[in-house]
């Protein structure tokens, strides 16, 4: 039973890091794709470069990071046998 709990915790941590990497990739490059849904019409400044949208994405990344640290917490030490 303890092995299953440990494996679940490891998978949760791995999944969390994968989510963070994907979020960072989204913030850095995917916003500027030509077909991205949040782009403005041609000849206008892309919404991704506007201060409000950039601030919202940065705040989202910070909130997700803080929440993840609260959920995952510190790694627990094994109880002595």
Swiss-Prot record:
User: What stretches pass through the bilayer?
Assistant: none
Keywords in alphabetical order, please. Developmental protein
GO CC annotations? Answer: cytoplasm
Give expression by tissue.
Highest in brain and ovary.
What InterPro entries does the record point to?
A: Neuronatin (IPR024885)
What's a BP term from Gene Ontology annotated to this protein?
Answer: brain development
Give the function comment from the record: May participate in the maintenance of segment identity in the hindbrain and pituitary development, and maturation or maintenance of the overall structure of the nervous system.
Family, as annotated? Belongs to the neuronatin family.
Q: What's the protein name?
A: Neuronatin
| Natural source organism | Mus musculus (Mouse)
Tell me the lineage of the source organism: Eukaryota, Metazoa, Chordata, Craniata, Vertebrata
